[in-house]
């Protein structure tokens, strides 16, 4: 493989752009389908399969394996906010004890990963402490730098001082109880549902599924460029399929 294209979703448009750029392999985050199905109708699923089969280009999805690696690009927003690991005494299970210390604390631990002769805890969502407590206005300003075009929705009331923040790109509202148990002041995620929002143990900021993971994949492409120097890596940007709509415009 000499040319690799990286994208969030394997949509027909993204696949066409990747192929027109000469991609010999396409790496997406989300799978083409979440469950097995037949190509029994002419839709986007059929179209993507036709495109990659005709071009003889493999399509690979790094989904939960990427989501669960706290040392990967999934932690990009935590890095930008300058979050650091919380004391082990504040976690539900104490210190993970898997060998390698992590810069952040994993929320929902699912196992371990091997790296450089050592192992470390992996799982979904991270939680960390701010170097300096933030006000809600401080947080707004920082998020505005990185979540351009996002229309966040807040469930709950933010405290006047925000010290500990949990983050889970994608759909992470199910982690709210564990984030609260770790003493988090806020959970940042996407895809928050109405009835879930009515019964949360801490404030949850829904910044959208797309905004966190699109930037995650852009940074993943940059990491691959740096670490796999003999492969030309192209990031294929996309647009949020959920566009803001104002009835007053």
Roles of regions detected by a PLM:
Residues 1-249:
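Active-site catalytic microenvironments in core metabolic enzymes, especially phosphate/sugar-handling
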């Amino acid at each position: 493989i000499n040319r690799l294209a990286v994208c969030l979703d394997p949509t027909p448009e993204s696949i066409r752009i990747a192929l027109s750029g000469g991609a010999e392999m396409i790496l997406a985050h989300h799978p083409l389908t979440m469950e097995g199905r037949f190509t029994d109708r002419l839709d986007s699923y059929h179209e993507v399969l036709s495109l990659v089969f005709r071009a003889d280009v493999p399509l690979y999805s790094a989904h939960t394996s990427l989501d669960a690696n706290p040392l990967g690009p999934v932690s990009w927003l935590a890095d930008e906010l300058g979050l650091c690991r919380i004391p082990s005494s504040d976690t539900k299970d104490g210190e993970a004890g898997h060998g390698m210390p992590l810069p952040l604390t994993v929320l929902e631990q699912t196992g371990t990963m091997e790296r450089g002769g050592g192992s470390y805890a992996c799982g979904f969502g991270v939680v960390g402490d701010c170097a300096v407590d933030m006000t809600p206005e401080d947080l707004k300003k920082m998020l505005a730098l990185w979540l351009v075009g996002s229309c966040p929705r807040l469930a709950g009331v933010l405290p006047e001082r925000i010290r500990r923040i949990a983050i889970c790109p994608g759909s992470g509202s199910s982690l709210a109880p564990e984030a609260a148990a770790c003493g988090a002041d806020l959970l940042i995620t996407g895809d928050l549902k109405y009835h879930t929002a009515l019964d949360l143990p801490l404030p949850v900021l829904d910044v959208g599924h797309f905004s966190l993971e699109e930037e995650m994949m852009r940074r993943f492409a940059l990491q691959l460029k740096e670490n796999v120097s003999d492969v030309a890596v192209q990031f294929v940007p996309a647009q949020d399929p959920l566009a803001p709509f104002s009835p007053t415009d």
